[in-house]
């Protein structure tokens, strides 16, 4: 744990918020340098949802046929599943960076102790890691949307907003992952968020079938999860079934991400600064 004694900061020509982003940018640049010779690793989590799309969306979709969505809209099963797997792809990018990589930087490599010896503070570290994780999640999203476009799974003009919408998804997942990793003590603890939270969310958040088939109490629990709101938001845009409720999904993801980010910063400060 680093013991930090900071001098009185010198005047800065930038407003506080802009100054924080400029400092956090250094963390992003550092991560880019680290990955410059192993960039293929960034795409590792992209392939899992792609294989699900090919295996389940098309393989199982041949037997399932069409799916009736809210409002009576009928779409092919692959069209129904694809935006949910886009949400999962975004989540994979966020979680891979914020849980795995941040955990090792924090507990083994002691990267942040070294960073705190520079003008950067804990808030700059948290913001920088959030920005980098969102970049990685966005790369996943861009690649997956390109696959959906080639496969003819974007059936609405609203789909042009799918990529901007993934930014709200990545904010929620990146901030949540960053906060979660501060509670993990050993490598074995990875099983807890993945086995008890991430996998159940993936299976039950309307990924493969509408949540209307669940009992009401389970529907309520599912609607509390960020992945459900990400799936519903992206599915509405890519299928054209756009209703005012998408604003609620956006609001939820933005609020969830903001609260999780505040928690992540406080937890990092408690672990790094004495």
Question: Which positions does each model-derived feature cover?
Answer:
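Membrane-interfacial helix-loop-helix junctions in multi-pass membrane proteins
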Residues: 34, 202-259
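Pore- or pathway-lining transmembrane helices of multi-pass membrane proteins that form conduits
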Residues: 43-44, 186-205
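Short, membrane-interfacial amphipathic segments enriched in basic
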Residues: 4-28, 217-228
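Alpha-helical transmembrane segments and their short interhelical loops
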Residues: 122-194, 241-265
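Short alpha-helical transmembrane interface motifs in multi-pass membrane proteins
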Residues: 11-14, 40-41, 53, 80-84, ...
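Junction motif at the cytosolic side of a transmembrane helix
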Residues: 2-8, 63, 238-241, 251-274
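Hydrophobic alpha-helical transmembrane segments of multi-pass membrane transport proteins
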Residues: 51-56, 76-150, 177, 196, ...
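Membrane-interface helix starts
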Residues: 29-48, 247, 273-274
């Amino acid at each position: 744990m680093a013991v930090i004694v900071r001098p009185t900061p010198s005047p800065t020509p930038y407003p506080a918020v802009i100054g924080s982003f400029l400092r956090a940018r250094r963390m992003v640049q550092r991560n880019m340098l680290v990955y410059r010779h192993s960039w293929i690793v960034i795409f590792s989590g992209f392939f899992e949802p792609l294989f699900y799309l090919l295996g389940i969306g098309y393989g199982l979709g041949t037997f399932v046929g069409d799916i009736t969505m809210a409002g009576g809209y009928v779409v092919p099963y692959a069209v129904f599943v694809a935006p949910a797997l886009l949400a999962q792809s975004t989540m994979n990018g966020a979680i891979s960076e914020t849980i795995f990589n941040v955990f090792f930087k924090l507990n083994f490599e002691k990267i942040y102790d070294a960073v705190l010896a520079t003008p950067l503070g804990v808030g700059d570290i948290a913001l920088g890691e959030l920005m980098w994780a969102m970049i990685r999640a966005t790369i996943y999203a861009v690649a997956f949307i390109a696959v959906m476009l080639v496969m003819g799974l974007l059936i609405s003009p609203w789909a042009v907003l799918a990529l901007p919408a993934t930014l709200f998804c990545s904010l929620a997942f990146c901030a949540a992952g960053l906060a979660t990793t501060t509670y993990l003590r050993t490598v074995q603890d990875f099983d807890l968020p993945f086995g008890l939270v991430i996998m159940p969310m993936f299976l039950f958040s309307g990924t493969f079938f509408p949540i209307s088939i669940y009992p009401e109490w389970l529907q309520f629990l599912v609607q509390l999860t960020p992945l459900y709101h990400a799936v519903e938001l992206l599915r509405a845009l890519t299928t054209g079934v756009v209703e005012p409720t998408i604003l609620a999904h956006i609001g939820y993801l933005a609020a969830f991400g903001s609260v999780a980010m505040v928690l992540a910063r406080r937890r990092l400060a408690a672990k790094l600064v004495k």
